């Protein structure tokens, strides 16, 4: 009775304490891993092993597996140790002979448990990688569901996902077959030990060495101990998964970002930034494609404060890469990128990017209201008035559309801005960029994905912004009609600038730029 009461209290305390501790640890661990993901440089996400699906799967599963290590494995270890010590003490007190006979078989019990646990752990690495890949496939399909639906490729992704999940299924079956043998061996040894101890006990009773009561208590205590030790193999699989997850988790926690956002550097107020830009003898290769040079030491560009600088050229020549290096998504292998004569590496990362705003080809809006999306462009801690939001929207040529909506600026845009057209999303993205009051505005083919009517509205907004002055604009343009008024047009080819000048100066050269103009059937006399 006393043993039962103590066990009741002990098991309850164990379950409660370890579950609470595990949940608290998991919450902190997930937050730490997510923070570590956000600190990594952009090149980290270019690697195949670091796709959205793989990372989100790891974020969900690794923390869960480590949680099981804390709640189940650690709790079971404490329980087994406590049970073993208590059981052996009781068994020795009531009859040391039965206890010693049972302990003589302990190497066989431990061997069977080790065999089963080895089988359990042996599949964990392969299974974890297989689950990551299946998560990657699912993430890709769901993320691009509109494209998948438009192309009618649901069947393709269903088959691909089925193949991806088939591997962990096959591994699970192999594991089940082998584990069944290990489990049977483990339990068989335990039962054999119990039978041997009981047989010896009956012989001792016949010889009047012990009485039945002492045999019963001693045998029961030692068998509880043996069963507890035998259970060690049960959580071997949990331990294996948790170990692999812990290794992966601490790899990301301990990984030092190549472009660390927490490093200190120049902290300059935006009002003191002029907006001069320069790229000097840049050499660059993407970390995920080190064998393919983008810039080979010959990329040089200088832009003065207040200028509009346009980069044109064929796809893959490095135009967007230049913008990425200016924002320090990537650092050059060699050469220097400067903002106002300062190497961009000398700025703190947050301060550097606070002087810039980027509007990309595919505008990204978050699942919040229009007003919140625009305010999202301002650094945390800075107060933004509704008037400032509306002024930014007017400058982006989107204010009238917003106030005509039933909920106005409180209208939710949906996931990825799904409730809005491409042109509307782009103009809201421009408003978000403008509310930052940047000294450098970066436009990466901001109109190339729009229809003619939306392009006209967006381009009108961009022209108005440029005409205001007060900032340097670096724009990448596929449609040359949008950059004819730029102060400096640079033609990028094979990783270097082969021509630069105004629209008319480059037309007179009758070389690369003029060929691009003719290719787009642009009226050179316009």
Where are these regions (language model features)?
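Cytosolic ends of transmembrane helices, especially the final helix of ABC transmembrane type-1 domains
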Residues: 23, 150-153, 177, 218, ...
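An intracellular "coupling" helix at the cytosolic face of ABC transporter transmembrane type-1 domains
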Residues: 61-70, 74, 119-140, 149-197, ...
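Hydrophobic alpha-helical membrane-associated segments
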Residues: 6-22, 105-119, 145-146, 197, ...
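Transmembrane-helix motif of ABC transporter permease domains
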Residues: 1-27, 47, 111-112, 173, ...
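ABC-type nucleotide-binding domain
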Residues: 270-526
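Transmembrane helices of ABC transporter permease
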Residues: 76-125, 199, 203-210
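Short intracellular "coupling" helices and adjacent cytoplasmic loop segments at the cytosolic face
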Residues: 23, 31-57, 63, 137-160, ...
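Conserved catalytic Walker-motif region of ABC-type ATPase nucleotide-binding domains
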Residues: 161, 249, 279-281
């Amino acid at each position: 009775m006393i043993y039962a009461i103590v066990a009741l209290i002990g098991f309850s305390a164990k379950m409660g304490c370890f579950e609470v501790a595990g949940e608290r640890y998991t919450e902190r661990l997930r937050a730490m891993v997510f923070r570590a993901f956000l600190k990594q440089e952009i090149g980290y996400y270019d690697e195949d092993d670091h796709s959205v699906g793989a990372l989100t799967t790891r974020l969900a599963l690794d923390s869960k597996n480590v949680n099981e290590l804390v709640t189940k494995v650690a709790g079971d270890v404490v329980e087994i140790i406590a049970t073993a010590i208590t059981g052996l003490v009781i068994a020795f007190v009531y009859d040391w002979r039965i206890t010693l006979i049972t302990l003589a078989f302990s190497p066989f019990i431990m061997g069977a448990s080790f065999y089963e646990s080895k089988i359990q752990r042996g599949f964990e690495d392969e299974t974890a990688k297989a689950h990551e890949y299946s998560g990657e496939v699912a993430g890709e399909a769901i993320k691009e569901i509109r494209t998948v639906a438009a192309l009618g490729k649901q069947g393709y992704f269903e088959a691909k996902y089925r193949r991806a999940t088939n591997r962990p299924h096959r591994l699970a079956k192999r594991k089940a077959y082998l584990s069944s043998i290990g489990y049977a061996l483990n339990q068989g040894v335990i039962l054999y030990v119990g039978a041997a101890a009981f047989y010896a006990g009956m012989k001792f009773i016949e010889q009047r060495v012990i009485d039945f009561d002492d045999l019963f208590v001693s045998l029961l205590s030692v068998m509880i101990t043996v069963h507890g030790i035998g259970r060690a193999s049960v959580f071997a699989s949990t331990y294996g998964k948790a170990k692999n997850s812990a290794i992966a988790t601490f790899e990301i926690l301990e990984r030092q970002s190549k472009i660390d956002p927490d490093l200190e550097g120049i902290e300059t107020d935006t009002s003191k930034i002029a907006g001069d830009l320069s790229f000097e003898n840049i050499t660059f290769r993407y970390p995920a494609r080190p064998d393919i040079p983008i810039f080979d030491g010959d990329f040089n560009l200088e832009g003065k404060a207040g200028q509009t600088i346009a980069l044109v050229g064929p796809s893959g020549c490095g135009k967007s890469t230049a913008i990425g290096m200016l924002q320090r998504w990537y650092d050059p292998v060699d050469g220097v990128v400067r903002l106002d004569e300062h190497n961009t590496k000398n700025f703190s990362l947050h301060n550097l990017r606070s002087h810039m705003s980027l509007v990309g080809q595919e505008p990204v809006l978050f699942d919040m209201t229009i007003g919140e999306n625009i305010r999202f462009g301002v650094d945390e801690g800075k107060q933004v008035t509704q008037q400032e939001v509306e002024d930014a929207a007017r400058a982006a040529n989107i204010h009238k559309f917003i106030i005509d909506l039933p909920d106005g600026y409180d209208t939710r845009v949906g996931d990825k801005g799904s409730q809005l057209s491409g042109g509307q999303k782009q103009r809201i993205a421009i408003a978000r960029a403008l509310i930052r009051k940047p000294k450098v505005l970066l436009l990466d083919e901001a109109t190339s994905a729009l229809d003619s009517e939306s392009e006209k509205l967006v381009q009108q907004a961009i022209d108005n912004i440029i005409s205001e002055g007060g900032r340097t604009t670096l724009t990448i343009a596929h449609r040359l009609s949008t950059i004819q008024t730029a102060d400096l047009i640079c033609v990028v080819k094979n990783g270097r600038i082969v021509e630069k000048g105004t629209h008319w100066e480059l037309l007179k050269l009758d070389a690369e730029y003029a060929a691009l103009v003719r290719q787009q059937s642009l009226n050179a006399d316009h």
